[in-house]
């Protein structure tokens, strides 16, 4: 399946949501990246960037201030590949902490026991990224398939929590999370 990325809007977080464009924002494979698993990152200067991609490739694009369109880069391209590691599979996420950009992603087989989250650090959101290692792996006593995450920061503190999905050991369907 090709996949696709759309934009939905609502006046309230709980919805209801409606399709903002009437068509996908991205509906094609570019640089080998399947259009899935988008993550929007707002940098300190107010610029919004979207990271997305499956099938072992990750793209980055600039978004308009209203988040409804893609703004071409200075070279005229809409997408730049920023795949951080040969082990990248899907689920990109970025945060900025102490002036450094932390890029995280899922790797391994998403239906198997080796699905996990790895991370890299860079001085800019564009890279180059230096892989540091894995930040989340399965606990064979608890569950498998730990991956595809987000991170939240406790307001006013240098404290973060990772939120992810996994499968209990009793679950045998690799597509169940």
Name each model-derived stretch.
Residues 1-177:
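Carbohydrate-active catalytic/glycan-binding domains of CAZyme proteins
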